[in-house]
């Protein structure tokens, strides 16, 4: 990612418009924001720039979760997020279906890429949910009770593991889960 990527061409805007949920005008506006936060002007965000960009949009979102988002959307594992990767991220987060959002979140927390959320991975997701719930003014005790019941419902086979299928199927049925996951 070098200086050659620091300008967005008309064909880039058209490509992103066709491959995201954004209009050409929205792509151009997002690009203007992107340039403001691309402090070194190299046409991509490093981790710090990415976090600052998202903090400007989601000030209460925990930084460690923004770092997880960075890892999830760094599709080429270059430790940078170029504009196309950013628009995919924003498209899913902002305009994606509940299923798209749940898939991304599952992938973020399934660190070992096993297709199963193990207890440690579920505990990390629960911590995020508690933070979001508290930031929405809910009591920690009420959130904890809701989350425990929700995860009991999601874990259909009661093996204390949550498969991708269980998470997507039950998660899509729970608007409260989506809210507590910050999506």
From Swiss-Prot:
SMART domains assigned to the protein according to its UniProt record, in alphabetical order: EFh
UniProt-annotated binding residues for Ca(2+) 3: 155, 157, 159, 166
InterPro entries tied to this protein: EF-hand-dom_pair, EF_Hand_1_Ca_BS, EF_hand_dom, Recoverin
Transmembrane segments: none
A GO MF term: calcium ion binding
CDD domains: EFh (cd00051)
Binding site for Ca(2+) 2: 110, 112, 114, 121
This protein's GO CC annotations: phagocytic vesicle
Keyword tags: Calcium, Lipoprotein, Metal-binding, Myristate, Repeat
Any one Gene Ontology BP term: regulation of signal transduction
Name of the protein in question: Calcium-binding protein M
């Amino acid at each position: 990612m070098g200086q050659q990527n620091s300008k967005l061409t008309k064909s880039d805007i058209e490509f992103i418009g066709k491959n995201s949920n954004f209009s050409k005008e929205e792509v151009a506006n997002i690009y203007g924001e992107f340039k403001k936060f691309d402090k070194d002007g190299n046409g991509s965000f490093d981790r710090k720039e990415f976090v600052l960009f998202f903090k400007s949009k989601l000030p209460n979102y925990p930084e460690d979760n923004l770092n997880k988002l960075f890892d999830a959307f760094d599709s080429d594992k270059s430790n940078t997020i170029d504009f196309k990767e950013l628009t995919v991220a924003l498209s899913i987060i902002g305009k994606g279906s509940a299923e798209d959002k749940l898939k991304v979140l599952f992938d973020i927390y399934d660190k070992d890429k096993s297709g199963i959320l193990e207890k440690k991975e579920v505990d990390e997701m629960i911590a995020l949910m508690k933070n979001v719930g508290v930031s929405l003014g809910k009591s920690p005790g009420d959130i904890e009770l809701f989350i425990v019941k929700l995860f009991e419902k999601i874990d259909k086979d009661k093996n204390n593991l949550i498969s991708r299928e269980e998470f997507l199927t039950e998660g899509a049925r729970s608007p409260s889960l989506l809210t507590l996951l910050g999506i």
